[in-house]
Structure formats: C-alpha cells, structure tokens
Regions:
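Intracellular terminal tails of multi-pass secondary transporters
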Residues: 1-13, 19, 24, 34, ...
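Extracytoplasmic
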Residues: 2-34, 50, 55, 105, ...
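Helix-breaking motifs and short loop linkers at transmembrane-helix boundaries and internal kinks
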Residues: 14, 30-31, 54, 62-63, ...
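Conserved MFS/SLC helix-loop-helix module at the cytosolic interface between two early adjacent transmembrane helices
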Residues: 49-91
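Helix-to-loop junctions at the C-terminal end of transmembrane segments
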Residues: 50-63, 278-295
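Structural signature of the two symmetry-related core transmembrane helices
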Residues: 66-80, 297-312
C-alpha cells in the first residue's frame, strides 16, 4: 500500500503543477491567450481518454507492474520537458504525452487492489491511495511555493524550477517502483505457499483473477456495453468530472480574482485540500468500521451535497463577500471522496478479468471526458469570476445526485431479484455462497454468476 500511495500522490502532484504555475506567471511567460490555458487541461485528458482502452489491453497481456513502472519513468521525463517549453504548442505537445503516460495508473491500481484484497477490504485500500491526491497536494503546494520563491531573481523562471523539481522526484520514484511494485504471483518476497494462500483468500470475492496474462474474452467486452451498472458509473463519473475538472483547473485563477497575491493564493488553497483529505479519512474510517454495511452510494450522495452548496456560493456571491466565497470554495472539496467511492465500485461490483479491465477503462475514459468538457465551460470572456462555468458545475453536481439516487434503487432491486430467484430454487445461503465462489474461479462475469451480489 505505501508504494501505491506514494505513486498516486506524485502523479496528482504533477497534475496540479499546471494550476500552481499560473501563480508564478506561466501564462505570461509562454504567451497564453484566450482559452489556450483551458486547452492545456483538455488536451491532457483527451490523450488520457484515448490511451485508456489500449492500456487496458496491454496491462492484461503484459506484467501490469512493469507497464506502470515504465510509464512513471516516462511521465517524469515529460514533467522535465515542461520546464523547457516557451509557447502553447510546446506545452500542448508535452501535456498530451503526459496524459497518455498517466492513463494506466488509476485503473491499474484498482486492479492491483483487487488482486491483493478481499471485497470488504478493497474500498478502504482504494481510499488510502486516492487520499494521497489531497495529502500530497498540501505539501506539494508549499514545496512549489518554496521552490518558486527561491528561483525568483535567478536565471530560471519560478514555474520552470517547479517542473524541474517535480520531474526529478517523479523519475527517481519510477526507478524505485520498477523494483518494488508487484502482484501476488510475482512478489519475490512471498514463498510459493504464501502466494497460494494469497490467492485462496480471494475466492470469496467471486470476481475471478485480477492478474496479467489472462485471455481476453470478447463476450465480456460486449457485456460491458449492455450492463446498466456500467452506464450508472460512466454517467455519474462524467458529470462529476465535468464539474470538478473545470473548477479544479481554474481554482488558482478564481482565487486570484479575489485580489489575492501569490502567497495568499497558495495559502488559501490549503484548507480546500485539507477538507478533501479529512473527508476521505472519515469515509475510510466508516468503511473500515462497518465493512458489511452497504453505505457506499449513501456516502457518495451525502458528500456531494456540500459541493453543490459550495459551487452555488461561488457562482452567486461577488467579491464583496470574500469569506462567503472562500467558504464556498473550500467546501467543494467534499466532492473528492464521492468520486473515489464511485471509481472503486468497478473493483467491488464487476467480475471477469476482461470485463473488469474494460469497466475500469470506461470509467476513466468517462473521467477524462469530463475533464475535457469542464475547462471548456470556463470561457475567457467570462474571466475572472467565470460565472457561466460555475453554473455549469452546479448543474452537473445536481444531476449526478439524481443519478446516484436512481442507481441506489436499481442495485437494491437487482439484489432482491437474485435473492428471490435463489430462494425459488430452494438454495440455502451457504449453498449460494459456495456455488458463487466456485463460479467466480472460472473467470465469469457478475451477470453470469447468479450468486453474485452487488455492493451499494
């Protein structure tokens, strides 16, 4: 888990560096005009989206841990390259390549978690590495500020120094990752007997193998496109990512519109990331304390409520109500754990190795689509407060809430339908569990396994 957590934190640090660099005159030094800054974010996530399905296939065919290690080394080099950019074209090219190389990280990590942990353990572990987004952000923001301030007056611009610093960190960690990241079957520090035990404890998951080298099954790919659950995950992810993508990309610029200086802009972002981290920790505690309870969708719905309120405050208040806007800005951070809960659902509720890979890819393609759409709603003509973009974010969060409510009703209905069918066959609970486990070992999907029950 520490390996996944550190890697995920470094990955997100690279993403937020673009926003941090705005405070140190990246737009002015690279002569960005109009919506070009928004396109730097959109281009990254468009490349991320296109690369998802190919990487899903690559990680099923080749050792996943090595694929991820090579991409981390590659993105470290890309972050170095950003420091050498002088115009929009160069920035766009490097950001696009960076998007391709970061594509396998989130879906790959979710599959690695399912390869090591039981279903009741997976959400907590997923939240642990997802929480590094906000935890690392707290320190990276301060580190970026320190590096940027130290570079003032030197021969190199502050934002270039920030990218050199993070590029070095990413590349060095990629080397460490190559020798440490592993699945149970390839773990050098496990004996053959321990590897067998690690596999045996996951039989009750009923989700099949989560390792590389398993045959790609076209029927499981097709099932992804006819499963209502995949559409719930995809649509909810697009809506939330459209809102969070636009808001997070322009967060620094929105804060600057409060007439804050560089130091204040950095400092006032810290409570936002702190709220994200603390709320993820609270969700993790609840999940760990009540592992058998179906609280996932209820928590996601509840956590989106303050985000809806926060975005409305941002959109409706003017700068005469500075603290009202700041509070609105900060409480939008509650959307973060809601997103992580939705993403983790693919590991919990999707069975079959090919279907799981495709579901992960579709989920993060939806995530990327949202992050492509969101920044484009923040028109340069509406700067610096971007009210149309904020109204768009509000509508997306509100619609996502409605969709989660419908999803919750559907999952409960589907589980009850399966229970009634099993009872009609005269099967006891023990018989259902045993047959479900045996079927799960055959790499069949959740829809093919009548004894699979969905978490919600």
């Amino acid at each position: 888990m520490p390996i996944l957590m550190i890697t995920y934190g470094i990955q997100y640090s690279d993403k937020i560096t673009l926003s941090s660099s705005v405070a140190f005159d990246l737009r002015q030094d690279t002569h960005l005009v109009g919506n070009e800054f928004a396109w730097l974010s959109t281009g990254f996530y468009l490349a991320y989206l296109i690369a998802e399905l190919p990487f899903g296939w690559v990680m099923q065919k080749f050792p996943m841990e090595k694929v991820i290690s090579y991409t981390v080394l590659g993105w470290g080099i890309c972050v170095f390259g950003l420091a050498a950019c002088n115009n929009f074209t160069q920035l766009m090219a490097i950001r696009t390549l960076l998007g391709i190389l970061e594509a396998p990280i989130s879906p790959g990590f979710l599959i690695i978690v399912t390869a090591w942990y039981k279903r009741e353990e997976q959400l907590l572990r997923s939240m642990m590495f997802f929480s590094m987004n906000s935890f690392f952000s707290l320190f990276i923001l301060m580190a970026n500020y320190g590096v940027g301030k130290a570079a003032i007056g030197s021969k190199i611009e502050s934002w270039r120094a920030i990218h050199l610093f993070l590029g070095a960190v990413s590349f060095l960690w990629g080397i460490i990752l190559y020798f440490t990241l592993c699945a149970p079957k390839s773990a050098r520090w496990l004996s053959q007997g321990e590897k067998t035990l690690a596999h045996a404890r996951l039989v009750s998951n009923k989700t099949g193998e989560s390792t590389s080298g398993i045959k790609f099954k076209w029927n499981q790919l097709w099932e992804c496109f006819v499963d209502p659950q995949i559409y719930f995950i995809m649509l909810t992810t697009i809506l939330k990512s459209s809102a969070s993508g636009g808001f997070s990309t322009f967060s620094t610029i929105i804060l600057q519109s409060f007439n804050l200086n560089t130091e204040q802009t950095i400092v006032y972002q810290l409570p936002w990331y702190a709220i994200q981290f603390v709320s993820v920790c609270v969700v993790s505690y609840v999940v760990n304390t009540y592992p058998g309870k179906n609280l996932n969708l209820i928590m996601a719905f509840t956590l989106l409520l303050p985000a809806v309120v926060g975005i409305f405050l941002e959109a409706l208040l003017n700068n005469d109500h500075l603290w009202g806007r700041l509070v609105g800005f900060w409480i939008t951070g509650f959307y973060t754990p809601a997103s992580f809960i939705i993403w983790s659902t693919t590991g919990l509720n999707v069975a079959g190795r090919t279907k799981k890979s495709c579901a992960q890819a579709i989920t993060f393609m939806a995530f990327c689509a949202g992050y492509c759409i969101g920044p484009q709603m923040f028109y340069a003509s509406s700067a610096p407060q971007y009210r149309p973009g904020l109204y768009f974010c509000s509508a997306c969060f509100f619609t996502a809430e409605l969709l989660i409510a419908v999803w919750y009703v559907w999952v409960r209905w589907e589980n009850r339908r399966r229970d009634k069918k099993a009872e009609a066959q005269g099967l006891t609970l023990e018989q259902r569990n045993l047959e479900g486990c045996l079927l799960g070992l055959q790499d069949i999907t959740d829809r093919e396994n009548p004894h699979f029950r969905y978490r919600y």
